[in-house]
């Protein structure tokens, strides 16, 4: 059977069905390179049902889903159709924004703090922003008293990009979404941006590609880079964010960057970096 069929089966899990096929395919191929024998098993199988009877394939299948959950699923809204129903409803625009932001864990956690966050991070009036691994966070710019002229965002779901573009258009903000895998970035990521957001993304990068954060940040072109870290693990049992602070300070020092400001909300540590 074809690898495409395996990819579609992986994406049948609701939280994963909005990820681009291309991203899932690259991840599957990368992991299969470590298990060449599985590729032969897939080619010879007549159906997904047959494949799932193979214990080694089933383990691989579950591991891929687990990785996608950690990279994307845990941060993404589960119901894209519901977001469009909200946008097409007659409720006030501000309520639409609130209802949408409640649909993903990171934005829901920030919901009561967005005014404070934007007041703290915009050391200069924003003009041009890019939000890397954005999810639906760009929608929250509604709560900033200063709106940028242009807002770009990067995600691995075209559905998420379309939602962000639609909502920002309603705010008269020029916007554009890039479907980019940050592990294999394209040139758009390295253009100049006044503000770059990299929120709750670094721990995932370092888990799956240790050392890549430094390589990525060294190539970014910005006035202000705002990174953030969750203060707790997903289970809420472990304190995490402050453990990343000295790590981030060392990375900034190694790259010749400066830490301009730090602040915390209830759930998140923010660090503002300048070249």
Name these PLM-found stretches.
Residues 150-155:
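Conserved SAM-binding motif I beta-strand of class I
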Residues 204-217:
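A short, conserved alpha-helix within the catalytic core of class I
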Residues 157-159:
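Conserved SAM/SAH-binding beta-strand->alpha-helix loop
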Residues 43-124:
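Conserved Class I S-adenosyl-L-methionine-dependent methyltransferase catalytic core
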Residues 125-137:
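Conserved class I S-adenosyl-L-methionine
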Residues 221-232:
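Conserved beta-strand signature within the Rossmann-like core of class I S-adenosyl-L-methionine
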Residues 162-199, 205:
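S-adenosyl-L-methionine
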Residues 135-148:
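Conserved SAM-binding loop of SAM-dependent methyltransferases across substrates and taxa
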